[in-house]
Design a protein with these regions (language model features):
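Glycine- and aromatic-enriched alpha-helical transmembrane segments of multi-pass membrane proteins
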Residues: 2-11, 308, 312, 316, ...
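Membrane-interface helix/helix-cap signal primarily in integral membrane proteins
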Residues: 12, 17-191, 494-499, 508, ...
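Aromatic-rich juxtamembrane segments at the membrane interface
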Residues: 116-248, 253, 327, 511-513, ...
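Di-metal (Zn2+ and/or Mg2+/Mn2+) metal-binding site signature of metallo-dependent hydrolases
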Residues: 189-214, 508-532, 641-652
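Internal transmembrane alpha-helical bundles of multi-pass membrane proteins
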Residues: 238-420, 428-431, 612, 620, ...
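Conserved beta-strand hairpin/beta-sheet module of binuclear metal-dependent hydrolase folds
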Residues: 360-363, 455-508, 598-621
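Active-site-proximal loop/helix segments of hydrolase catalytic cores
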Residues: 491-500, 514-515, 519-530, 589-675
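Active-site HxH/HxHxD metal-binding segment of metal-dependent hydrolases
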Residues: 519-562, 567
């Protein structure tokens, strides 16, 4: 440390940022405006299939409205000019909204992500006009050049190859399919899909070598290399990893010019200090942590492992470097993605040697493809072959039982103990006692993988899926889902249901009950079942209501499930499923039930556990309630039917069940007006405590050691509190 003062400065800086973040826990500022007119400067824009995404800054609007940056979305209904240029002064009419905090455990935190980038709000533009046609020429030129190069890639490659090349070389991930992202993530090689230090090092070193050898002296070659790398960074969007790599390459070239020794850890620290001075909150971004953790793992652990085993063999050094990366970044990956690839070291050792060739031939393909498509296609042939090979090997790896381990999100104390063990490991390795320091490392990994998400006897969670339904029941050994869909959240299975399950360490769902065939109860489940490898979370049995008279939507759902080879089971009145101490009884429907509304054919499930009784009612309405009302008595918990519609939860029904607590699953400001005032009034009249997913986020009840606990994810950040009246 004495020889590396920059490392000390960085540590002090990080501690200061952490203390500041802990002390300043302000409530987010509300930017809600239904319609507002404002002036702003265009910072960047990206064309999407359904319109544009723009980032604008220096926003000043009517009624003293102002903020630093806003992310704007423009679609086919937005009135806007045909051409936009970075630097344009825009006059915008839009609705402005604050970023939502996550409503469920495991859900992506768009509020945290955007605020760390300095973007304070989002808006949906109705009209965009150019007020002043100012243009930032270098940035705008590079932006347009990037679009032209993307067109070249698209013309020379098939869609899948073009998406990967654009991500790796041009920094544009919009063309990557979900299947490719998932495959690379499950194999632990998702980092190759981003422009990283590997790319910058290869490009920078090659440029410097060629310029110095054939064109100019060392000083000139270093300056030109730095300028070109900086422009390449702007061209590709200057991501966090690109910024780090460019700064570190600059430090290396400056050391070369000054005739000084290049110290990687000092350069890494200097790069981090530069980024944190500009955006301190970027410290909490997964991309920042992974980028710096990767390089730190290489610098620290390659020498440690090579010295311990007294080997400088290139293959062993590659394994040591990859192992070092995994050791440093493991808690970051588990905190962000909740899963870990056992074969990631092998995948990296196999795939990384190809990256130099892929990068060189891809750059050549882009350059030559701009002149003649034939030459471009020829150059991209190597990349296409490599990606096919990666896909084939990657699919083999993920099919190996236990290749991907879903651990759940580790707690803070687990992460601290893990890194504490890592620091102790580094001290012990100086003694050359392999067994001792390996045991220390093994202890850290063991602590990190400890299951901490099922320290309860029973858990019932109602997820925030917008205008839809999804409930999760967990025992010590099993997980059951009741419904899974939404009418206003896109890809609800991918972005809310599966992340929740993975964050809790769940890799297998024993039973999935689909109460009826409405999309807002099923589309997330179908999306999940139809995804590659079921997004890593398997489903045992799908249970549907047993009906003689089936509507078209029910038949369509049945066909989809059968086509995916799902294990199906049908329930009717009187059927039961017993799981551990949990008993799930079907109260409705019976096969000959003649329903007028498909909602009234919903599965109605009574859940019994010791002295607890819960009732799940799907979208059951008053006509269906009359079929079961005589079979009902007091329940502790009611999942309110049909999102709180006034046509459900009749007075007679509620008087019969008199639930202690009632949970309503509905979307924020939904177009149906759910929950209706009449329903809320009826629940109030019987003295039932009401919780709503649109206001409180995920609502969870846990039974542990004879006591019930409640946690509200959005309203109370998931903190448990004792329910004294249960």
């Amino acid at each position: 440390m004495r020889r590396r003062p920059l490392c000390v400065v960085l540590v002090c800086m990080i501690l200061g940022i952490l203390c500041n973040a802990w002390i300043n826990t302000k409530e987010p500022v509300s930017y809600e405006r239904e319609s507002i007119h404002f002036l702003c400067e265009l910072e960047e824009f990206v064309k999407k299939d359904n319109g544009y995404t723009l980032v604008v800054r220096d926003v000043k609007g009517e009624n003293s409205f102002s903020c630093k940056k806003i992310k704007l979305y423009a679609n086919e209904n937005t009135a806007m000019p045909k051409e936009l240029h970075i630097g344009n002064l825009l006059a915008v009419t839009a609705s402005i909204h604050s970023f939502e905090k996550p409503g469920n455990p495991g859900q992506f935190d768009e509020y945290k992500y955007n605020t760390e980038l300095g973007i304070t709000a989002q808006g949906f533009a109705g009209k965009i006009e150019i007020k002043k046609n100012t243009v930032k020429n270098p940035e705008d030129f590079l932006h347009r050049l990037r679009n032209q190069l993307q067109d070249v890639v698209s013309l020379c490659c098939d869609e899948k190859t073009a998406g990967i090349v654009s991500a790796m070389v041009l920094g544009d991930k919009s063309g990557l399919s979900d299947e490719v992202k998932q495959l690379y993530q499950e194999n632990g090689i998702a980092h190759v899909l981003a422009i990283s230090g590997l790319h910058i090092s290869l490009i920078g070193a090659s440029l410097f070598f060629v310029l110095r050898k054939y064109f100019m002296p060392m000083q000139g070659a270093a300056v030109v290399t730095m300028v070109l790398l900086f422009l390449y960074g702007i061209l590709t969007g200057f991501s966090i990893s690109t910024q780090r790599a460019v700064i570190m390459m600059g430090c290396m070239l400056l050391a070369r010019l000054a005739g000084r020794h290049y110290d990687g850890l000092s350069a890494l620290s200097f790069s981090a200090i530069c980024q944190l001075l500009i955006h301190p909150m970027v410290l909490f971004q997964t991309g920042f942590l992974l980028s710096y953790g990767t390089v730190l793992g290489i610098y620290v652990f390659v020498d440690v492992f090579c010295d311990a085993w007294e080997s400088k063999n290139p293959i062993w050094m590659a394994v040591a470097g990859t192992a070092g990366i995994e050791l440093v970044t493991l808690p970051i990956l588990l905190t962000a993605y909740y899963e870990f690839s056992i074969l990631s070291i092998a995948a990296n050792v196999l795939f990384l040697p190809f990256m130099g060739g892929i990068l060189v031939t891809s750059l050549a393909g882009i350059g030559l493809g701009s002149i003649t498509l034939f030459a471009g296609k020829f150059c991209f042939g190597f990349a296409h072959f490599c990606f096919m090979l990666f896909e084939w090997i990657g699919n083999l790896f993920v099919k190996i039982p236990g290749a991907v381990v879903i651990t759940g999100k580790p707690t803070d104390w687990q992460v601290l103990l893990y890194y504490g063990s890592g620091v102790l490991f580094l001290f012990l390795q100086k003694w050359k006692q392999k067994k001792i320091f390996l045991l220390t490392l093994a202890f850290g990994v063991f602590v990190l993988f400890l299951p901490v998400h099922n320290n309860f006897d029973l858990q019932i969670s109602n997820l925030d899926v917008g205008q839809g339904d999804c409930s999760c029941i967990r025992t010590k050994n099993h997980t059951i889902l009741i419904d899974g869909g939404s009418s206003d959240v896109n890809k609800v299975g991918k972005y809310r249901m599966v992340p929740f399950l993975k964050s809790q360490g769940i890799s297998y769902v024993s039973y999935l009950f689909l109460t009826h065939s409405d999309k807002d109860h099923t589309n997330g489940a179908v999306e999940w079942l139809c995804a590659a490898n079921q997004m890593g979370v398997k489903i045992g049995t799908v249970i549907l209501p047993k009906l003689n008279e089936k509507e078209e939507a029910y038949c369509t759902l049945l066909d989809e499930l059968r086509n995916k080879g799902c294990n199906l089971m049908f329930m009717q009145r009187g059927d039961t499923v017993t799981i551990d101490e949990l008993r799930i009884s079907c109260l409705h429907p019976y096969p000959d039930y003649e329903w007028k509304s498909a909602n009234d054919s919903s599965l109605v499930l009574k859940v019994n556990y010791q002295n607890f009784t819960g009732l799940f009612t799907g979208d059951l309405e008053e006509a269906g309630e009359k079929e079961i009302i005589k079979k009902l008595s007091h329940v502790n918990y009611l999942k309110v039917a049909h999102h709180g519609s006034k046509g459900a939860s009749s007075e007679a029904f509620l008087e019969q069940v008199k639930p202690d607590v009632s949970v309503i699953s509905c979307g924020k400001k939904n177009r149906y007006g759910h929950p209706h005032k009449e329903t809320l009034k009826r629940l109030e009249n019987i003295g039932s405590k009401v919780y709503r997913t649109d206001k409180e986020g995920a609502v969870s009840f846990e039974y542990q050691n004879g006591k019930w606990y409640l946690s509200l994810w959005k309203k109370e950040s998931g903190k448990k509190r004792l329910l004294s009246d249960w």
